[in-house]
Amino acid sequence: MKQILFIFLFIYSLNVQAKVVLPTIYSDGMVLQRNQPIRIWGQAAPKEKVIVTFAGQQQVVNANTDGHWETRLSPLKEGGPYELQVLGKENQIEIKDILIGDVWLCSGQSNMQWVVNNVTNAEVEKKNANYPQIRTLNVPRRMELVPIDTINAKWTVCSPETVGSFSGVAYFFAKKVHEETHIPIGIINSSWGGTIIETWTSLEASNSISSEHLNCYTKEDKLLSPTKYFALKNKKAARNDYPSLVYNAMIHPLLSLSIKGVIWYQGENNVGNAEPYTDWLTCMIGDWRQRWKTELPF
């Protein structure tokens, strides 16, 4: 009986792995950045042919030996809604109600994390929040020692029923821009209360910071490498213990999405060590711009 069960589970796992898969950030109601190439990627069986269809464009790609595949579609002007279809050998994925507009990354600590439910006159704001062309993606708050590529999050369309969980700063920004431009607005809320700027900065960029500004992290090492971390007996670490921990989990997975710019609301937790903040902010902004390959407005 156990042998039969094992064979069944093995065959089932092969069928699951053979299906084409998209990251969850490609979900119903998403907003893609206008006037920039659109990157679509996912997983499939090794060497599997994948057909991607979107807004009158179609691309055929083959997954590599690891099952990874990706393609880029031509830029589009603002508009929609569109439907994304991804066809593999075993299954087809359909993502609906996609808009093309401006996508803003909204990041920082508690002031950015503060939700509409907690603002002054919240009930009035929620009652009037009928903005179907404003959508948000709330990035889960977590940290990782090394950069990861995916997050478990889906887009949410703004409505009186949903807006309460939107970042207040991000929502009021999106509302103002949308009312002025009449362009769909996507807001990616990647924020975490109590964080310092260092944890939002990649490890590579942190290495460019003056050594005198890194003394607060470890006595023996200015930066803790993944190898040294895994060698520790006690692997417990808080989000502010070392540079890059939050960047790895909450910024790096977003690099596949083109964005218009960044709203940054952070600094309170660096007030006790304000002198090097200018260096860290300059470093982080430069690093994010380099990774998105554009001079993002902050």
What are these regions (language model features)?
Residues 1-4:
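Positively charged n-region of N-terminal signal peptides that target proteins for export
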